[in-house]
């Protein structure tokens, strides 16, 4: 009822309570999701991303259809507070060259497998807190994410507002052109 329709469950506090906390979060969110997804609910469907049911699951996208739009959503964290076994239950991508290359591959494959009108990535960044300027390295990383097929990068972690910008990237993948703007 507060107006939250899409949740990012991937951040550095997600596994603070280990697997018990992750299981409790998934149970609570799915309970609300089930209530919201009934035909007589006055609220839009509830979607989420960022947690795995088992350690064997991979990062995957959440597919959302809303008012005629096909939307992909994925929430990933680059930082963890707890490095126990529960870390394998989060959508985690190490902020290393290898980790980021692996994430780019996942995102490209998702965009190809599920053609969409909009692809949103919720990314909990490994970056210094309380810094208002956007680093050139961050801009370069975001450009690569755009080239991989992401349309909106919903980045979070610095604890302060940072500037935002739009960029134009070239993609080899086809982009849907039959988009209707909903009122």
Language-model segments: residues:
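Active-site-proximal segments of metal-dependent phosphoesterases and phosphodiesterases across multiple
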Residues: 1, 116-149
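Acidic/His-rich segments in extracytoplasmic proteins that coordinate ligands and/or metal ions
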Residues: 1-45
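Active-site neighborhood of phospho(di)ester-bond hydrolases with catalytic His/Asp-centered motifs
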Residues: 2-12, 42-52, 121-124, 150-161, ...
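Conserved beta-sheet core of the metallophosphoesterase superfamily
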Residues: 4-6, 136-183
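Active-site environment of divalent metal-dependent phosphoester hydrolases
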Residues: 14-26, 55-60, 79-83, 126-131, ...
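Extracytoplasmic/secreted proteins, especially bacterial periplasmic and envelope-associated proteins
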Residues: 20-31, 102-105, 109, 137-144, ...
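Hydrophobic structural segments
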Residues: 40-49, 69, 110-114, 119-121, ...
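Binuclear metal-dependent hydrolase catalytic cores centered on His/Asp/Glu-rich metal-binding motifs
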Residues: 63-122, 140
